[in-house]
A protein has these predicted regions:
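Extracytoplasmic small-molecule ligand-binding "clamshell" domains
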Residues: 30-110
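A ligand-binding cleft/hinge motif common to bilobed small-molecule-binding domains
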Residues: 94, 111-119, 165, 190-191, ...
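Short loop->beta-strand "edge-of-pocket" segments that line small-molecule binding or catalytic clefts
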Residues: 46-50, 144-160
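Bacterial signal peptide processing site
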Residues: 23-26
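Periplasmic-binding protein-like
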Residues: 52, 128-136, 183, 205, ...
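C-terminal motif of bacterial Sec signal peptides marking the signal peptidase cleavage site
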Residues: 18-21
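Acidic, polar ligand-binding/catalytic clefts
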Residues: 75, 79, 84-147, 215-222
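Ligand-binding cleft/hinge of the Venus flytrap
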Residues: 60, 74-82, 160-179, 208-212, ...
Length: 265
């Protein structure tokens, strides 16, 4: 849904500083601040938007609280940066416009890096890599290798949605139906109003966990270099702060733990 690198150039130090550094014993030159949070984020409140309707990445509990992998990642990053997370729900179509309007500081919502989005926002390093799958009624005869005269569902403004439009809309008698969220796409699949839904694998597996009877994933996974990252406004220094914090929670095993907890992988 839900791939650039910043190359930082180092300043040349003065000869005096070089001599001073060389005069110290090796055990005194260890960088004790390597894991320290950026001064700009310590004690800061960072407002983060998520969708709240894309399990297991993000969803809304019965009591209105937000949960899921994205929320766990956001909290882990804020802990690493010694900042306070304030996470708010925002509908998907308005999530980038809300960021640009400064309603919040970042988007952590299973958002894929795309060229179109990169024209509007900056992305952190990826924190998850996705593949897409076909989800269908197993008794319906849907064949992903020969899709014809089918109604195909997905979510608008997402990587699977764009893939459906680019590859199937108006071709071989196929119709693409895009929805505001995947909940509605899955409802139409369950009611028989669509033949298949193209979704990210983890989202499809999450839905199948409660709707396995008569439904399943068919065909091969579609790997289209779908990397999920954090969106911030163009030129915002938060990108570097998030990149540093992501590197830390990846190296200390916290990111892998959150993946296992939310996805079982």
């Amino acid at each position: 849904m839900s791939n650039s690198r910043l190359l930082w150039s180092s300043m040349t130090v003065t000869a005096a500083l070089m001599l001073s550094a060389c005069s110290q014993p090796a055990d005194e030159t260890t960088d004790t601040n390597a894991n320290a949070p950026a001064a700009e984020t310590t004690g800061k409140t960072i407002r983060i938007a998520t969708e709240g309707a894309y399990p297991p990445f993000n969803y809304t509990n019965a009591d209105g609280s937000l949960a899921g992998f994205d929320i766990d990642v956001a909290n882990a990053l804020c802990d690493q940066m010694q900042a306070k997370c304030e996470i708010v729900a925002q509908d998907w179509d308005g999530i980038i416009p809300g960021l640009l309007a400064q309603k919040y500081d970042a988007v952590i919502a299973g958002m894929s890096i795309t060229a179109e989005r990169q024209e509007k926002v900056d992305f952190s390093e990826p924190y998850f890599a996705n593949t897409m799958v076909w989800l269908t009624n197993t008794d319906g005869g849907f064949d992903p290798m020969a899709i014809k005269d089918a109604t195909l569902g997905g979510q608008r403004s997402t990587t699977p949605g764009a893939y459906l439009q680019d590859n199937y809309e108006g071709k071989e008698g196929n119709t693409v139906q895009l929805y505001d969220n995947y909940d509605n796409a899955y409802l139409d699949l369950k009611s028989g109003r669509s033949d298949a839904v193209l979704a990210e694998k983890v989202s499809a597996k999450s839905w199948l966990a409660e709707n396995a009877a008569g439904f399943g994933i068919v065909g091969d996974e579609i790997d289209n270099d779908d990397n999920i990252a954090i969106a911030v406004r163009k030129g915002d220094s938060l990108k570097a702060d998030f990149d540093k914090a992501l590197s830390e929670i990846r190296s200390n095993g916290e990111l892998a733990r959150l993946e296992q907890m939310n996805f079982g992988q």
